[in-house]
């Protein structure tokens, strides 16, 4: 009897486990997913308890970023691994040349080059790229190429080459080509575009000189040194007695004296022996002052550049500054305040083409260049002759031209012609060191 009771109880228990009659044999998709989903991959319950294995988690099977982070612990190491794991190693082909080191990035790479190389793949030699024809060799001022070695930089005598071997720092209180009043207020000099131009604020054209005869305006000029100025040779074409000529530095407004002016007499006038009166070829003159001027915030020389620097670098700069007190309009009144204008330099071919179609334009030679606006809105004018055409480069201004000739003030379709100073740099330097006495001299260019 007892065994039968036990069997009956067992049967009831099994029926209870099966559930009520009519229960469905299959479960829903959501329930099945809940049963089958595994939070972590492992071959056994014990493996879930083991520390993460790179071989097991990511090499044998595809792993997620979260799983990789559990393995590496460090976010930085995880990121480095994941870039290669998910995208492939962009450095595998060794793209960096000349000993460069490759760093893999997502779908890209970066090469860290050795000191003498540059470029995306370190393919460019700096010694080959750093030549004076390429952006002046990155030099602040003067650049010189050397066969077999990289270029070297140097500076004007008023400056010192810095340890970086490219920068030039002033070594005197008033170096040439700098504008003290602008630097002291730490602002940019106005870049206005003498006809249609702007007043040059006091002190912002500190190299501007003015030649006067018997107290009247004769020509403009430019200070190169404490004792020397440059102007146009044609300014003396009709002067019988040059002893009446004075030079004024620090002048700004003809209608008033403010105490910053310095007046000097002229003791020497030196012209090229090939200059012919009434012609404009070789239109340049060097004047010696009877005693040096004193450099101040309002009297500073303009830098006379090296010839190669002027021809290869400065000549490529489109806009330069011209200044003077010339007539504001053709046959009009002379300006009382110093005026300045930014003029574009014209291509030599355009200049020659213009001269070909103009009966008034002189024959353009290699000793000249043209600048100005063909619409006639802005131009140098009579009275500006001899004034500076100054070009700015890396914080310093240089003398690139001397105002020589123009067809009236801002005549439509006409341009200004300037003496190309680079043709006379050697001549100027040579005679600034001369021991000539008082007088007018015509000296050979060679």
UniProtKB/Swiss-Prot annotation:
Keywords linked to the UniProt accession: Blood coagulation, Calcium, Cleavage on pair of basic residues, Disulfide bond, EGF-like domain, Gamma-carboxyglutamic acid, Glycoprotein, Hemostasis, Hydrolase, Hydroxylation, Protease, Repeat, Secreted, Serine protease, Signal, Zymogen
Keyword Nucleotide-binding: no
Segments passing through the bilayer: none
Native organism taxonomy: Eukaryota, Metazoa, Chordata, Craniata, Vertebrata
SUPFAM superfamilies linked: EGF/Laminin, GLA-domain, Trypsin-like serine proteases
Highest taxon above the source species: Eukaryota
Site (Cleavage): 193-194
Signal peptide: 1-24
Tissue-wise expression: Plasma and liver.
Domain Peptidase S1: 194-433
Listed EC numbers: 3.4.21.21
Prodomain positions: 25-41
Physiological role: Initiates the extrinsic pathway of blood coagulation. Serine protease that circulates in the blood in a zymogen form. Factor VII is converted to factor VIIa by factor Xa, factor XIIa, factor IXa, or thrombin by minor proteolysis. In the presence of tissue factor and calcium ions, factor VIIa then converts factor X to factor Xa by limited proteolysis. Factor VIIa also converts factor IX to factor IXa in the presence of tissue factor and calcium.
GO cellular component terms listed in the entry, alphabetical order: extracellular region; extracellular space; serine-type peptidase complex; vesicle
GO BP annotation list: animal organ regeneration; blood coagulation; circadian rhythm; positive regulation of blood coagulation; positive regulation of leukocyte chemotaxis; positive regulation of platelet-derived growth factor receptor signaling pathway; positive regulation of positive chemotaxis; positive regulation of TOR signaling
Annotated residues for binding of substrate: 379
Source organism: Mus musculus
Domain Gla: 42-86
Residues modified as (3R)-3-hydroxyaspartate: 104
4-carboxyglutamate modifications at: 47-48, 55, 57, 60-61, 66-67, 70, 76
Protein name: Coagulation factor VII
Gene: F7
PROSITE patterns: ASX_HYDROXYL, EGF_1, EGF_3, EGF_CA, GLA_1, GLA_2, TRYPSIN_DOM, TRYPSIN_HIS
Post-translational modification: The vitamin K-dependent, enzymatic carboxylation of some glutamate residues allows the modified protein to bind calcium. The iron and 2-oxoglutarate dependent 3-hydroxylation of aspartate and asparagine is (R) stereospecific within EGF domains.
Predominant place of localization: secreted
